[in-house]
Amino acid sequence: MAPNLRKSHPLLKMVNNSLIDLPAPSNISAWWNFGSLLGICLLTQILTGLLLAMHYTADTTLAFSSVAHTCRNVQYGWLIRNLHANGASFFFICIYLHIGRGFYYGSYLYKETWNTGVILLLTLMATAFVGYVLPWGQMSFWGATVITNLFSAIPYIGQTLVEWAWGGFSVDNPTLTRFFALHFLLPFMIAGLTLIHLTFLHESGSNNPLGIVSNCDKIPFHPYFTLKDILGFMLLLLPLTTLALFSPNLLGDPENFTPANPLVTPPHIKPEWYFLFAYAILRSIPNKLGGVLALAASVLVLFLAPFLHKAKQRAMTFRPISQLLFWILVANLFILTWVGSQPVEHPFIIIGQLASLTYFTILLILFPITGALENKMLNY
């Protein structure tokens, strides 16, 4: 009998073991779709980004007009740009839901997979930040100025570090060119990290909604989950296309329709919606260095998740108190996102401070205590 090429060819064998004959738990729900959706987001962003880069000029005098030119004169340039800009939003929606799923079902106990995932999140945030600067509108310029300036809070080396990052004494042409280079490079780094992420995942196999070992009940990835993933792709690409075609500027800032002007500061400097929760945490601390540390901690706290797991059960499926805490945390993140979009005045300042305190209290204190408490409850 001739050998099956799919199982014997050195390259096809890898594809087969990752996407076709991969044993997957039979009961994984739609919450397990977001990994493949993130893959589709990445592919879409790289493809549209490549097409945009062909028409973009990374120069302060030309950047804004080159983007306008792409939208006006390039065939379907407006569509490519709208898909790329809104694709970023969908990328973040998917990654936040993916992380939420991991948190709820205790997937973070696969430490290597979880840690590479957090590194992926940080890389994605860096990519989105440098990408937002490229159209060189008002919010691009001032966002870049405000966020890069945060590095100056680092004691002793801060100021030198910022000037080194800027390539001068303010955000200017050298900053724009290097941000374009970084924005081109980082997505490929994300793709590489994704392969590492998957390699670690396939070492252990997927978790499942019950949080128990499922080796006795596995099904092949193809056709079951390939089909389920295709449904997911359709449900992702449909709203993305709808948003890009019907209301492409819904999530953008009107300030970015004005070319960058270092002499005029916009009334409210705020990042895109997906950074607002972290921005609110940054603003809630009246000290510059303290704010920067809180901002870093808001994402880096995810690295601690495996060490803060005190429950005997892995998933929150049968842990109602932890579930309640989890959904309070989700609501709290929505509050932080809303506060981040508001001006710095009463009552938003105090709301932001309370929400920031709640965020860290739930993650660092209440989750471990609740886990231990639920262990006690198992005895009764």
Swiss-Prot record:
Keywords noted in UniProt: Electron transport, Heme, Iron, Membrane, Metal-binding, Mitochondrion, Mitochondrion inner membrane, Respiratory chain, Transmembrane, Transmembrane helix, Transport, Ubiquinone
Membrane topology: Multi-pass membrane protein
GO MF annotation: an example: metal ion binding
Cellular-component GO terms for this entry: mitochondrial inner membrane; respiratory chain complex III
Amino-acid positions noted as binding heme b b566 in the UniProt annotation, renumbered to this chain: H98, H197
Binding positions for a ubiquinone per the UniProt entry: H202
Cofactor(s) the protein requires to work: heme b
Annotated heme b b562 binding sites: H84, H183
Co-factor binding details: Binds 2 heme b groups non-covalently.
Subcellular location: Mitochondrion inner membrane
Transmembrane feature ranges: 34-54, 78-99, 114-134, 179-199, 227-247, 289-309, 321-341, 348-368
Primary location class: mitochondrion
Gene Ontology biological process terms in this record: mitochondrial electron transport, ubiquinol to cytochrome c
Residue ranges the record marks as coiled coil: none
Pfam families (UniProt xref): Cytochrom_B_C, Cytochrome_B
Superkingdom of source: Eukaryota
UniProt function note: Component of the ubiquinol-cytochrome c reductase complex (complex III or cytochrome b-c1 complex) that is part of the mitochondrial respiratory chain. The b-c1 complex mediates electron transfer from ubiquinol to cytochrome c. Contributes to the generation of a proton gradient across the mitochondrial membrane that is then used for ATP synthesis.
Family (UniProt): Belongs to the cytochrome b family.
Extra remark: Heme 1 (or BL or b562) is low-potential and absorbs at about 562 nm, and heme 2 (or BH or b566) is high-potential and absorbs at about 566 nm.
Assembly and binders: The cytochrome bc1 complex contains 11 subunits: 3 respiratory subunits (MT-CYB, CYC1 and UQCRFS1), 2 core proteins (UQCRC1 and UQCRC2) and 6 low-molecular weight proteins (UQCRH/QCR6, UQCRB/QCR7, UQCRQ/QCR8, UQCR10/QCR9, UQCR11/QCR10 and a cleavage product of UQCRFS1). This cytochrome bc1 complex then forms a dimer.
Name used for this protein in its record: Cytochrome b
Protein source organism: Puffinus opisthomelas
Taxonomic path: Eukaryota, Metazoa, Chordata, Craniata, Vertebrata
